[in-house]
Amino acid sequence: MNFEFSSDQMLLKDQARKFLESEESVKKAREVLEGEQTHDESLWKSVIEMGWTATTIPEEFDGLGLGYLELCVIAEELGRSLAPTPFSSSVYLATEALISLGSNEQKQNYLPKLATGEIIGTLAHTESTSSPSIENLSCELNSNKLN
């Protein structure tokens, strides 16, 4: 079994690293942490333009249709550089939940928008079949444990 990245994956990794170094993402992360922003908008737009938000989205939904190893090399470089973007919520959480569990209608509606960065995704979960509301919560936090 070969655990090495392919030459294409190494090229992607090198390009991602060089790009993120040129963007001074560590400096941008500090600015986001010390400011009111949720992420660095200009860096996020660049990530979208590079096609990284479309990495694992199937081509039929306007994605690149690449695999998890390609996603891994991009994610590793984003993490290494502390890139302050909503990549994790949009790509790992929302995109993967839709690919794995979404109806065809949900996939057609949301995956192309996630691929192009038109929307930022995240994952939400509710406890019951009732509408999400603080009054409907039965889960409590006691001694740092959910009960």
Name each model-derived stretch:
Residues 1-88, 109, 113:
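Amphipathic, small/basic residue-rich leader segments at the start of a protein or domain
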Residues 4, 56, 93, 124, ...:
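Conserved beta-strand segments that form the floor/walls of ligand-binding pockets within enzyme
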Residues 15, 23, 77-78, 91, ...:
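Fold-independent oxyanion-binding glycine-rich loops
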Residues 19-23, 97, 121-122:
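Short alpha-helical functional segments enriched in proximate histidine and acidic residues
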Residues 37, 50, 92, 117-119, ...:
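Short, basic and Ser/Thr-rich N-terminal targeting/leader segments
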Residues 63-64, 105-147:
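Glycine-rich, Trp-frequent "lid" loop and neighboring beta-strands that shape
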Residues 83-105:
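N-terminal glycine-rich flavin-associated loop
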